[in-house]
Amino acid sequence: MMRAGGLLKLGVLVSVLFVAVFLAFELLESNMNFNLGKVFTRYAPPDAVPTRPLRHKCGLSKSCPEDHFAFKITSGAASVVGPKMCFQDNVIMSGVKNNIGRGINIALLNGKTGELTKTDSFDMWTGDVNLLIKFLKDIEDGSIVMMATFDDPATKMNDEARNLIADLGSSSISILGFRDNWVFVGGKGIKTKSPFEQHIKNNAETNKYEGWPEVLEMEGCIPIKHD
């Protein structure tokens, strides 16, 4: 009986020792895998490390060619949210910058350097259209002209002002009406109509907001003026 009891104790001791050794090896292997994982992650080649999505200037969907300026322009939303203009990754007009107003908002930039030269807004509901006309006449040749509407852009607009804007490359200025939304990028001295223009009519049946159409957003790449 004593011999049998001793053998039983010995068997239990061997089993416990075996389990302890097994667990020790398991723990060691787990630590080695963890450490090796850290090492391989640290020294992984660049293409194996996740990267952030590439961001383009002004949040454009793709980068502009090297000899172009990037821009994005958004019209106002009803009479609540004003327009926003971005040029070469710099916001040049917005509500936050406090340089926008009801009517037509305009930014002028140097066509060679991209330097912002002037911004202004003209109230076309109760304002004086002659102020807009003078501003348009004073634009220097070679200037990039960005325009965006807010609230009402057309009540005070007359033929002289429309013709001056058409000379900047606009195709839609002749039909711009009460509370229409419109965004445009043209230039002083342009020889053709600008490809950068969007216009949406104020229509009670299709308006997104009560009394106003939906917001317009336009982006693009403007060739740098070299001559």
Swiss-Prot record:
Assign the protein's first listed, main location to one coarse class: secreted
Keyword Endoplasmic reticulum, does the record have it? Answer: no
What InterPro entries would the database entry show?
Answer: FAM3, ILEI/PANDER_dom, ILEI_FAM3C
The UniProt entry, under Pfam families, shows: ILEI
Q: Where in the cell is it found?
A: Secreted
Q: Which Gene Ontology molecular-function terms are recorded?
A: carbohydrate binding
One cellular-component annotation, GO: extracellular space
Does this entry carry the keyword Protein biosynthesis?
no
* S-S bonds: 58-86, 64-221
Q: Keywords assigned by UniProt?
A: Developmental protein, Disulfide bond, Lectin, Secreted, Signal
Q: Where is the signal peptide?
A: 1-30
Question: What sequence ranges are listed for the domain GG-type lectin?
Answer: 67-225
User: What does the record give as the function of this protein?
Assistant: Involved in retinal laminar formation.
Instruction: Name the family the entry cites.
Output: Belongs to the FAM3 family.
Which protein are we looking at?
A: Protein FAM3C
Q: Which organism is it from?
A: Danio rerio (Zebrafish)
Q: Which gene encodes it?
A: fam3c
